[in-house]
Amino acid sequence: MSAALFSLDGPARGAPWPAEPAPFYEPGRAGKPGRGAEPGALGEPGAAAPAMYDDESAIDFSAYIDSMAAVPTLELCHDELFADLFNSNHKAGGAGPLELLPGGPARPLGPGPAAPRLLKREPDWGDGDAPGSLLPAQVAACAQTVVSLAAAGQPTPPTSPEPPRSSPRQTPAPGPAREKSAGKRGPDRGSPEYRQRRERNNIAVRKSRDKAKRRNQEMQQKLVELSAENEKLHQRVEQLTRDLAGLRQFFKQLPSPPFLPAAGTADCR
């Protein structure tokens, strides 16, 4: 009769554990509707509670909502795990020490009756990845992201440099000072100083032109000299060629002595 009072799809009534839907099947017998109920499959709430929740863990999604509402800056991280850890560290001071029962959720130790409070089961951490070492780094990264986004939202200053402020020294001086500054532009064209400057400039231009002309004349003179020397060399080569041809003709006309071979076999070349 006790087994008929509990619904397999609804929460258990009068149970000491939290009122949440939980499967009451054993791990090895789930998904086998053909087999009949065996003794010990469904037990009384008080007697079977420790053995029923050995391989199960309850997940409370309200912790994620509370943590994101309490710490809005962590929304930029898109990391619910670190947000939940951050919220649990802030609430650890007022929650008090917790006692982990072997068959049920953690309950706070303290005077007076207290309602059972769920404790979310965290994933296993490795030896090198401790929650205490990763959480400060993540919080610092989130803070840097918030600062960078806040700075990006502010209007940027203009890149062009502002014109320098006018100082008292740069203000135009009245009277003779203004006339003096105006006189620095140059002497009058009819003044003798202007004529002297023009004459000096003309002399410098003439000297540079004369120097360029002299260089051009020197190069032309060298070109003429080299051309004449080249012509002489060509004439010398032609003279030597004619002398060689005359010597060959002379040696061909010489009579052959008796102790020398015939002229047809001997070649002066």
UniProtKB/Swiss-Prot annotation:
Q: What is its main location?
A: nucleus
Q: Where is this region: Disordered?
A: 1-48, 97-133, 151-219
In UniProt terms, what is the effect of altering residue 120 to A? Loss of sumoylation
InterPro entries from the UniProt entry = bZIP (IPR004827), bZIP_sf (IPR046347), C/EBP (IPR031106), C/EBP_chordates (IPR016468)
Entry keyword Acetylation: yes
What the record says about family reads: Belongs to the bZIP family. C/EBP subfamily.
Please explain the role this protein plays, according to its UniProt record.
Answer: Transcription activator that recognizes two different DNA motifs: the CCAAT homology common to many promoters and the enhanced core homology common to many enhancers. Important transcription factor regulating the expression of genes involved in immune and inflammatory responses. Transcriptional activator that enhances IL6 transcription alone and as heterodimer with CEBPB.
Question: What is the official name of this protein in its record?
Answer: CCAAT/enhancer-binding protein delta
Q: Which organism is it from?
A: Homo sapiens
Lineage summary:
Eukaryota, Metazoa, Chordata, Craniata, Vertebrata
